[in-house]
Amino acid sequence: MKSINDRYYMPVINKSFTGRWFESDMEFNTLYPLSIQALARCHWTSLPIAVKAAHFLAGDSDAKILDIGSGVGKFCLAAAYHTPKAWYYGVEQRKSLIYHAEVAKCNLGLNNVSFIHGNFTQLDFKKFDHFYFYNAFYENLDGTDKIDDSIDYSGELYNYYNRYLFKQLQQKPTGTRLCTLCSLESEVPADFHAIHSDFDGFLKFWVKV
């Protein structure tokens, strides 16, 4: 549950120096209250990974990229800053995390990023060109670190979400790009080929052929 301090946390931002927030993870994470910063190591994409994924996904001008399970928006915000000709959309079930993402977006003054409060199964995947996935379903499994207790968890949901994403990716056209981080790859159809990996294989770059 958010504290009063979390709810009204507003870092002092000088938008003339927006770039400094992207110089390090430590600097960027101070955009958020301490309770959110504490989750960064396990749950939020690091800046070096976000930058590499963004440059791969934003190969097309005006590409629309969906982050499935966007949390507090760190990937979307970093990607939007580094690839300003692409459009980033983050979908997240937890309203509290959407709040923190929106505050950070406003403070950074980024216009090519939007956040959607809801379940990714409610979205029309035809509206998006490429996808980023940081194993958002994994916390449904027993014994895993969970962000909070505000949503339901179960092995059944883990399997359902993986099957659903698999089917949506199956329907995407040739050339669709996908970046996965720390994924077990059960959501990746066979016609997506891994063309590169980085960060000891945890980050993978896929293209549908």
Positions of PLM-derived features:
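Conserved class I S-adenosyl-L-methionine
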Residues: 62-71
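S-adenosyl-L-methionine
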Residues: 1-60, 100-126
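Conserved SAM-binding loop of SAM-dependent methyltransferases across substrates and taxa
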Residues: 74-85
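C-terminal substrate-binding/active-site "lid" region of AdoMet-derived donor-dependent transferases
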Residues: 140-209
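Conserved SAM-binding motif I beta-strand of class I
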Residues: 87-92
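Conserved short alpha-helix immediately C-terminal to the canonical SAM/SAH-binding motif I
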Residues: 96-97
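Short SAM/SAH-binding signature in class I
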Residues: 128-142
